Amino acid sequence: MIDLPWDLEWVESDIQESLLEYEGWSPMGAGHGVGGEHVERFSGVLPESVLYVWRRFGFDGFADGRFWITDPLVWAPVVDAWLEGTALPFPDQRWWCLNRTAMGDMQLWGEISGPALDVDPILGTLWPSAGDAADMDNFVMRERMGCLTFTSPLKDSFEDEVSGRLVVDEAIERLGPVGEGQVYGFTPAYCFTGRMEARLLGVEDAIAHLVFLAQAQDHQLGQDFSAAAAQIAAQIATDDGGESPGGSGGDGGGSGGDGGGDGGGVW
């Protein structure tokens, strides 16, 4: 079994290589630092890797505000609004918003299930990941995923239906970067018009706007792609195991090779 690195030296290395160098996302220096009360409040609740990132950057934005580390206490009303009345495929637990995008996509961390829930407030969709939740029993994976929550950041991917450009890029050019307590929001909201046009965007108060979106539309649970991938892997393993006893070793290998070729063509 491979021993995966997970200590704070690895966390710092991943910050440098994945976030600052590969993504090229420099911190804006526009947020605020994390006080000792936050570290004390979340010590033992969140991985040490998360607390390290907090101490390293504070609640700051990156790449002209495309991505923000969030204060989970400030963002608690938004989380509550989106989870209210929503049946999740996880045990009951407290969820915290650890980061978000310029347009309000949020990555939530469950105290039991970890980074197993993303929220898309524009489409009204919550995306679960049972695969991530399953890793939380492993201390090493918990620490690594705490780091990856920030070094593999969420990105706004909506395209302007007229220009074909990323909506967030057009918004930054026209409106400037959003601040710590701001998001870009459509007026009227997308859930009312279905129009994805950057010209309809304005700068909104983040908490008020995202709570409004939670109350203005039905919430839907998106497909858990991690569960689907696990089912496919299990089915492949079952199929491979079922074929080999049927004939000679050569026949079994040939059949397995054909199956692998078909699978590669499909995926």
Locate each region found by the language model.
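Intrinsically disordered, low-complexity segments
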Residues: 237-267
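Compact, glycine/acidic-enriched structural inserts
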Residues: 117-159
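A surface-exposed partner-binding patch
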Residues: 1-117, 172-239
